[in-house]
């Protein structure tokens, strides 16, 4: 009997475990089904949004007892991750609150917690979407208007904080302003005086805030035909216009209006007192921006009108399109399809809105959110999906950009060149060049001919020289790039008179015979130390002729392709390192690369990048070479600044990498110490796996890492000091010479150069910011010319 009972017990235990697994599996299936239903509510289907909501409320109400926490989590996630469906989800919550007041209160608490956590973790978009959701719950009779106004007032209190960055105060004001389109009408009807008081406080703040940063962020220096408005000023103008219209807007779908008779019977909840977390030095706030405008209603003659620049609909449409790009930017085809499936496409000139928003992203200052090619590839997909209209709108936009290029920001000029050349390469390089031939009468440094020349140089990278020559009208001959071939002087007509010719020819033979680096060194020993007596670059600390012969000969032999050049550099890396012991020697190497490859800009860019990666030349040497007298004729060409920026980025990445490694090492060391002490105290069954001795870095290793980081920071600071000092020198010299000669200093050269200075500040703002006090003390002092000093002050104001 005992055996039988034991057997029965085992069967019962097995059945219990099987039933438990089945229940877990069934619960998981129900949870997945609920999540799918919630995520898809309001999307296009055969039934209306309202009937979808009614059906979903019935399903959720039945499952609240079992899956309450899961439903709370999904709904709060949707509020943050799907802001375009905000009113659909607030209506859903409102209907659930009308049926189950307790659940409504729990959801409000959950949403408040999400909002507070987002603020604490500096998730600014998530915080703004959470605030918007809470505000829209007022429309659904879930939250009282009084408690929402208290929250908005508390947020505006931040604008009165002292000793905090303006960008913090700006964000809280922006968050409140951007919420008002959803709830303004309800507040106006129920609490008009409180709403007016809130708006007055916002106006007082906006009138006194500094806008020193504004000019640094403009796409164009001119306000004709469209003003370049600072984002808070623009949104404030849109809110004022909305107030004039009695808070009636035409864009936001409001499904809760259909259920008003149900919702108005529900009891409301009061928001708790919410205090924004205080400022900490490690908090990073969104930087200000300028609202980009390319079109107005006169540019889109057919179909629906484009909303005015100060209509709230323009803000709502643009924000929605920006969010679509943010959500789908990794998949260009999906992104293009989603943009063209914009919910209100029949009410607006959609193609114009999309093109304007994409260029707003591309030209966003200080840097775009994503790579330039991301926007280019999305535009190509849009042209494929909408071939009847979008290419024409894009051509119209390109024409507008070209006509306004005279006053375009230098960074945006570069992005325009990169986008247009990439776009042409995907459409057989077809363009109506004859319409732009008036630019051929302008000075070569003028932005219009300069743009075409730079576009052709970029097209050359994406094609070949003969193709570029064939695609251009003969009138553009002077702007067509020269054939990119090496200029190897040791086989030229004057080679017999050059001091290194004999050794160069000997070196050619040896390298072709696959000689070793040691054999190359021995051949170079035949060049006497004083062999370059007539060369001003040689100061006695290195042999310039050895560098000349070796670099030009080796790279000429590897000139067939990038791969051949890289292989040559890698094979004779030791020789390069031996010759490049000093910064002067490294500059001499760069001089010889330029002398050999002056007609092939891309080759120079990739070779210098390779030399930096292999640590043959230092970043400071590249910066010094760029500002040398030899490069004066190249100073306004894009490739030179491409080299400077890749050099600075290389240094920045190195510093960031060392920072991360040091932080990880310190964290491991700290965890190892705490783990060893915890292990002694824990009981055996609770003991965690301690960090092993192999994982734990020693104190000496951490100290060495700190020393490496300190040295890297010193080199980074030195690099920025070299760059900014050289800028100041050449700009000051130009301004002084113009003043002495009685000439207008505002030349094309000056605008390019001051634009490049601004570009360095903005493109590398995160790293430069660390040294702003040093730069202010050593370089950007009060006695500096105001034109140069303003660029620095505008940069500092970005995070002030």
From Swiss-Prot:
It is found in: Nucleus. Residues 31-243 form the MIF4G domain. GO terms for molecular function: mRNA binding; RNA cap binding. Residues 1-26, 669-698 are annotated as: Disordered. One of its GO terms (cellular component) is nucleus. InterPro entries: ARM-type_fold (IPR016024), CBP80 (IPR027159), MIF4G-like_typ-1 (IPR015172), MIF4G-like_typ-2 (IPR015174), MIF4G-like_typ-3 (IPR003890). GO terms for biological process: 7-methylguanosine mRNA capping; mRNA export from nucleus; nuclear-transcribed mRNA catabolic process, nonsense-mediated decay; regulatory ncRNA-mediated gene silencing; RNA splicing. SMART domains: MIF4G. Gene3D superfamilies: 1.25.40.180. The modification Phosphothreonine is found at residue 9. Keywords: mRNA capping, mRNA processing, mRNA splicing, Nucleus, Phosphoprotein, RNA-mediated gene silencing. Pfam families: MIF4G, MIF4G_like, MIF4G_like_2. Component of the nuclear cap-binding complex (CBC), a heterodimer composed of Cbp80 and Cbp20 that interacts with m7GpppG-capped RNA. Component of the cap-binding complex (CBC), which binds cotranscriptionally to the 5'-cap of pre-mRNAs and is involved in various processes such as pre-mRNA splicing and RNA-mediated gene silencing (RNAi). The CBC complex is involved in miRNA-mediated RNA interference via its interaction with Ars2 and is required for primary microRNAs (miRNAs) processing. Also involved in innate immunity via the short interfering RNAs (siRNAs) processing machinery by restricting the viral RNA production. Belongs to the NCBP1 family. This is Nuclear cap-binding protein subunit 1. It comes from Drosophila grimshawi.
């Amino acid at each position: 009997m005992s055996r039988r009972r034991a057997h029965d017990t085992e069967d019962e235990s097995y059945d219990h475990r099987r039933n438990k697994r089945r229940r877990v599996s069934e619960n998981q299936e129900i949870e997945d089904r609920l999540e799918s239903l919630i995520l898809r509510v309001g999307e296009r289907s055969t039934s209306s949004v309202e009937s979808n909501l009614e059906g979903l409320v019935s399903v959720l109400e039945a499952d609240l007892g079992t899956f309450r926490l899961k439903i709370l989590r999904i709904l709060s996630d949707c509020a943050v991750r799907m802001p375009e469906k905000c009113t659909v989800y607030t209506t859903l919550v409102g209907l659930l609150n009308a049926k189950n007041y307790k659940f409504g209160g729990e959801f409000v608490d959950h949403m408040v917690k999400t909002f507070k956590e987002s603020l604490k973790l500096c998730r600014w978009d998530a915080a703004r979407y959470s605030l918007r959701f809470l505000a829209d719950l007022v429309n659904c009779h879930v939250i009282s208007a009084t408690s929402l106004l208290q929250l908005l007032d508390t947020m505006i209190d931040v604008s009165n904080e002292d000793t905090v960055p303006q960008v913090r105060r700006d964000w809280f004001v922006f968050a409140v302003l951007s919420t008002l389109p959803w709830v303004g009408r309800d507040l106006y009807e129920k609490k008009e005086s409180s709403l007016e008081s809130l708006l007055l406080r916002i106006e007082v703040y906006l009138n006194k805030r500094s806008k020193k940063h504004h000019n640094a962020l403009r796409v164009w220096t001119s306000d004709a035909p469209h003003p370049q408005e600072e984002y808070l000023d623009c949104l404030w103008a849109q809110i004022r216009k909305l107030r004039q219209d009695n808070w009636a807007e035409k864009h936001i779908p409001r499904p809760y209006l259909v259920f008003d008779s149900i919702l108005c019977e529900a009891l409301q909840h009061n928001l708790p007192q919410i205090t924004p977390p205080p400022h900490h030095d490690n908090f990073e706030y969104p930087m200000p921006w300028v609202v980009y405008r390319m079109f107005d209603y006169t540019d889109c003659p057919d179909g629906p009108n484009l909303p005015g620049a100060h209509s709230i609909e323009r803000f709502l449409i643009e924000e929605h399109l920006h969010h679509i790009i943010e959500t789908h930017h990794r998949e260009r085809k999906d992104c293009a399809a989603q943009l063209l499936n914009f919910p209100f496409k029949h009410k607006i000139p959609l193609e114009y809105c999309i093109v304007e928003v994409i260029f707003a992203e591309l030209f966003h200052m200080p840097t775009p959110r994503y790579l330039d090619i991301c926007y280019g590839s999305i535009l190509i997909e849009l042209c494929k999906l909408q071939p009847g209209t979008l290419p024409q709108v894009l051509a119209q936009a390109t024409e507008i950009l070209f006509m306004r290029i005279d006053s375009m920001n230098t960074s945006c000029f570069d992005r325009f060149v990169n986008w247009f050349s990439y776009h042409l390469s995907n459409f057989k390089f077809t363009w109506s060049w004859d319409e732009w031939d008036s630019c051929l009468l302008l000075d070569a440094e003028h932005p219009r001919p300069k743009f075409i020349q730079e576009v052709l140089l970029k097209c050359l990278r994406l094609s070949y020289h003969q193709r570029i020559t064939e695609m251009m009208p003969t009138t553009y001959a002077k702007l067509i790039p020269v054939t990119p071939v090496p200029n190897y002087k040791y086989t030229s007509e004057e080679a017999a008179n050059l001091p290194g010719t004999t050794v160069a020819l000997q070196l050619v033979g040896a390298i072709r015979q696959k000689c070793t680096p040691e054999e190359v060194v021995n051949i170079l020993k035949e060049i006497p130390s004083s062999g370059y007596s007539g060369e001003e670059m040689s100061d006695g600390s290195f042999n310039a002729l050895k560098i000349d012969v070796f670099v030009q000969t080796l790279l000429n032999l590897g000139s067939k392709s990038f791969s051949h050049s890289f292989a040559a550099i890698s094979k004779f890396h030791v020789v390069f390192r031996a010759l490049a012991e000093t910064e002067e020697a490294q500059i001499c190497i760069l001089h010889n690369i330029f002398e050999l490859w002056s007609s092939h800009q891309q080759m120079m860019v990739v070779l210098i990048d390779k030399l930096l990666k292999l640590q043959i030349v230092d970043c400071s040497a590249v910066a010094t070479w760029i500002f040398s007298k030899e490069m004066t004729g190249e100073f306004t060409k894009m490739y030179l600044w491409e080299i400077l920026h890749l050099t600075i980025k290389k240094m920045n990445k190195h510093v960031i990498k060392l920072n991360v490694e040091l932080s990880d090492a310190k964290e491991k060391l700290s965890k190892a110490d705490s783990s060893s002490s915890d292990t002694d105290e824990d009981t055996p069954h609770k003991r965690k796996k301690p960090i092993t001795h192999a994982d734990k870095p020693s104190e000496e290793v951490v100290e060495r890492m700190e020393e490496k980081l300190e040295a890297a920071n010193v080199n980074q600071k030195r690099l920025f000091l070299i760059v900014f000092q050289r800028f100041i020198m050449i700009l000051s010299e130009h301004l002084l010479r113009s003043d002495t000669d009685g000439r207008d200093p505002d030349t094309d050269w000056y605008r390019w150069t001051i634009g490049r200075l601004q570009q360095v500040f903005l493109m590398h703002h995160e790293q430069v910011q660390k040294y702003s006090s040093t730069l202010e003390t050593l370089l950007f002092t009060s006695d500096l010319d105001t034109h140069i000093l303003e660029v620095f002050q505008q940069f500092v104001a970005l995070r002030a």
